[in-house]
Curated annotation (Swiss-Prot):
The chain crosses the membrane at residues 30-50, 212-232, 238-258, 288-308, 315-335, 338-358, 380-400, 442-462, 537-557, 566-586. Expressed in neurons, oligodendrocytes and astrocytes. Also expressed in the mucosal cell layer of the colon. In the developing brain, isoform 1 is expressed in both neurons and oligodendroglial cells, whereas isoform 2 is restricted to oligodendroglial cells. One of its GO terms (biological process) is transmembrane transport. This is Choline transporter-like protein 1. Pfam families: Choline_transpo. It comes from Rattus norvegicus (Rat).
Length: 656
């Protein structure tokens, strides 16, 4: 592909970039490979459906291989198979709360029943009465309802008492317990570090009790993120100082409120509190102390960082001003995270559904207990691994399509001299160019990220499986490898994004674009450091502002429920969601800034302002980089390589 060809490198150094002029298809072999891979993903789904996995997944099946809600064929050498379950449409587990995490299944006999027990059944007499009234037998098919209380087999072939009240899961015809205590047992099996079962029960009940508040706070974080995007668009000059002041006030206010609540709850009388509420109060007090200490440490670190970067804050105003102009001309950029998230959700839903199909596909095999399991044998058993690789590659492909779309739109904006001549919808024009010319480049870039991500995930899995068993040296080596792969993945992701920008500008293949982008970034290393440090930090402050505001609102609202619920987990859920929402919105802004800078660097390298080679850039952006260079030089970090004076657009002087 020319990634390492010296001849290609020489040709690249002589080649002149012609933004938006020549357009051709790039990395076609990689597009064909990606299409073939997607066909393989479709084959896995089709194979699962064709072998009956879809019917077994949706309708469910009992422990003898009979699909509920239909007539079944007899399975060789398997008792109770081939039954007519036309009127038995629901799967009922005799012990639904008994979960086997290792084998990812419920360790219980499953039967097809006509109806789920809506009320708790405490005795076998209640089970018998339920069968006689509703015509739904909850014991094995070999036992008649009249024999439930008479036979000794009832303990093994009837449900575990008491039978919890259950309701059918929509679309999947499984009887699921409605009592959250059963789900608490599931979570207890997953969360092994919780030693006190009652703690987990209180945490889950806290989430269930505060679900309306959690939903409202999540919506608040979404609204705050959109408001921040509007502020960035219209008042970018004031935004930096507003963010700085608000983050200072927010971090101080949040830390102060946490310490105030801790002191208030610690001084509150406990003599009149009942034992159940006393335990909840102690949990809240401990959580408040941890939150307060963490917030204090975070605030101190944040202030130190802001103190070091105070001289560069003013420079960020110019950068945000130019990026704000992009959003004024390209307002649809704000909604790009929604389309990407929607595409990811659709793919993940398809992937999970196919994964569930794979869990019920294969040939019927009788296990040691005499029950039926479906297993895949031969080469087809490796479809799982293919499916997992598909999850990573296609997810990265969707994210890369977003990067290429944003890069194409911003490149169109930057290299259009008269902004009145911009396409009616630059975003759609960029999507059109992506589909027509550059899907192969996106496929190749996302595959490279996949190659790094898979080994890191394997090492993380090995590390988790060997936790507590390996020696200190092996543990250190594993963690070092994981960290190195993570750093490599981040570096490649940043280089990929700039490679997509280079492809959007000059329509070159991935290797050529990555090499050109890398050379330009190295030539402008000091400028990259200044822009990325200041710009990314201010966007990080925006994320902190949204999380602090949402968290502060959550503290005030959940504080009214501290007498009857533990709000540690609800607050964590809200803050995590707020950060994810803020990250999705502000990452687009960060992407625009990176694309603008690469366009600027290319502009200054290949144009000098003379007739026929006029600059494309905005004057504000050039002034920003010049001021950044001066600031770094005054700090003693400027170098001779960056000592040339940048000239404004009208001057006609060259600059690098």
């Amino acid at each position: 592909m020319g990634c390492c060809s010296s001849a290609s490198a020489a040709q690249s150094s002589k080649r002149e970039w012609k933004p938006l002029e020549d357009r051709s298809c790039t990395d076609i072999p990689w597009l064909l490979l990606f299409v073939l891979f997607c066909i393989g993903m479709g084959f896995i789904c089709g194979f699962s459906v064709a072998t009956g996995a879809a019917a077994r997944l949706v309708s469910g099946y009992d422990s003898y291989g009979n699909i509920c809600g239909q007539r079944n064929a007899k399975l060789e050498a398997i008792a109770n198979s081939g039954l007519d379950h036309t009127h038995r449409k629901y799967v009922f587990f005799l012990d639904p709360c008994n979960l086997d995490l290792i084998n990812r299944k419920i360790k219980s006999m499953a039967l097809c029943v006509a109806a789920c027990p809506r009320q708790e059944l405490k005795t076998l007499s209640d089970v018998q009465k339920f069968a006689e009234i509703n015509g739904s037998a909850l014991c094995s098919y070999n036992i008649k309802p009249s024999e439930y209380t008479l036979t000794a087999k009832s303990s093994a072939f009837c449900p575990k008492l008491p039978v919890p009240a259950s309701a059918p899961i929509p679309f999947f015809h499984r009887c699921a317990p409605v009592n959250i205590s059963c789900y608490a047992k599931f979570a207890e099996a997953l969360i092994t570090f919780v030693s006190d079962n009652s703690v987990l029960h209180r945490l889950i009940s806290g989430v269930m009790t505060s679900k309306e508040i959690i939903l409202g706070l999540c919506l608040l974080s979404l609204v705050l993120s959109m408001i921040l995007m509007v502020i960035i668009r219209y008042i970018s000059r004031v935004l930096v100082w507003i963010l700085t002041i608000l983050v200072i006030l927010g971090s101080l206010g949040g830390t102060g409120v946490l310490w105030w609540l801790y002191a208030k709850q610690r001084r509150s009388p406990k003599e009149t509190v009942i034992p159940e509420q006393l335990q909840i109060a102690e949990d809240n007090l401990r959580a408040l102390l941890i939150y307060a200490i963490s917030a204090t440490v975070f605030t101190v670190i944040l202030f130190l960082i802001m103190l070091v970067m105070r001289k560069r804050v003013a420079l960020t105003i110019a950068l945000f001003h130019v990026a704000g102009k992009v959003f004024i001309h390209l307002p649809l950029l704000v909604f790009q995270p929604f389309w990407t998230f929607f595409a990811l959700v659709l793919f993940w839903a398809y992937w999970i559904m196919t994964l569930l199909f794979l869990g019920t596909t294969g040939s019927a095999v009788q296990n040691e207990q005499g029950f039926v399991e479906y297993k895949i044998s031969g080469p087809l058993q490796y479809m799982w691994w293919y499916h997992v690789v598909g999850l990573i590659w296609i997810s990265e492909f969707i994210l890369a399509c977003q990067q290429m779309t944003v890069a194409g739109a911003v490149v169109t904006y930057y290299f259009t001299r008269d902004k009145r001549n911009l396409p009616f919808t630059p975003i759609l024009a960029s999507v059109n160019r992506l589909i027509r010319y550059h899907l192969g480049t996106v496929a190749k870039g996302s595959f490279i990220i996949t190659l790094v991500k898979i080994p890191r995930m394997i090492l993380m899995y090995i590390h988790s499986q060997l936790k507590g068993k390996e020696n200190a040296c092996a543990r250190c080596m594993l963690k070092s490898c994981i960290c190195c792969l993570w750093c490599l993945e981040k570096c490649l992701s940043y280089l990929n994004q700039n490679a997509y920008t280079a492809t959007a500008i000059n329509s070159t293949n991935f290797c050529t674009s990555a090499k050109d982008a890398f050379v330009i970034l190295v030539e402008n290393a000091l400028r990259v450091a200044a822009i990325n440090t200041v710009g990314d930090f201010m966007l990080f402050l925006g994320k902190v502002l949204i999380v602090c505001s949402t968290g502060l609102a959550g503290i005030m609202l959940l504080n009214y429920q501290q007498d009857y619920t533990v709000w540690v987990l609800p607050l964590i859920i809200v803050c995590l969601f707020a950060f994810l929402v803020a990250h999705c919105f502000l990452s687009i802004y960060e992407m625009v800034v990176d694309v603008l800078f690469l366009c600027f660097a290319i502009d200054t390298k290949y144009n000098d302002g003379s007739p026929g080679r006029e600059f494309y850039m905005d004057k504000v952006l050039m002034e920003f980089v010049e001021n950044s260079r001066k600031a770094m030089k005054e700090a003693g970090k400027g170098g001779a390589a960056d000592a040339r004076k940048l000239k404004p657009m009208a001057s006609g002087a060259s600059s690098a």
